[in-house]
Amino acid sequence: KKSKIEKLYYFTVEDWKINRGKHLNNIRNTFSSNIIVRSSSFGEDSVDKSEAGKFLSVLNVNPKSNTELSRAIQRVINSYNSHSVLDSKNQVLIQNQTKNVILSGVLFTKTLESDSPYYVINFETSGSTDSVTKGKVSNTIKIFNNTKQNQIPSKWKKLISAVKEIERLTGNDSLDIEFAITPIDVIIFQIRPLTTVRKNLSKDVIKFVGNKIKKNE
């Protein structure tokens, strides 16, 4: 396998209102260390625009504290409401918080302006994923999709290899991928198809890729 997907748990806003206790118990039993509570909304990235950072993500949440966890989840849900994105099918994602991050960012498998075959990598080297979740990455590099592996800068070889695997597994070469790089792994946070029709498939795609990667282990 070329990348790692952090353990993932998710639910809709509607289901949270109905089954809050069940989800708190499931999260407490699923995660042993600090987590990040993330948004996954119909209002997030598409081929026409990026909404990265529009909705809240909460870092350093203790999964064993019902009070802290409930507050973090509600803050994410409130961020939907504050932007008038009130669809009850909006989701909340719970993931392990990645440690020892060297750099993190967002990669587009095509240029948004002209659909050109370049990997566009927007990244930060602060050592935190906070810039990604807030949509504040400030460095950009473009790498031609068909660049030979030995010609790719060493800093990006593992990431590009992981992205090519994801493209192959999904059968989709128009993707928006949130990632982090640690000394050991390429971590994939979210995968969104770059299409105006399929805006909210991030958790479905990421589960599909995760299952495929596990089968190849």
PLM features: residue spans?
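ATP-grasp fold ATP-binding core
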Residues: 1, 5-12, 28-60, 83-99, ...
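Conserved divalent-metal-coordinating catalytic cores
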Residues: 1-2, 11-20, 47-50, 67-73, ...
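Glycine-/small-residue-rich beta-strand-loop submotif within the FAD-binding core of flavoenzymes
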Residues: 56-59, 65, 71
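Catalytic core of tubulin tyrosine ligase-like
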Residues: 77
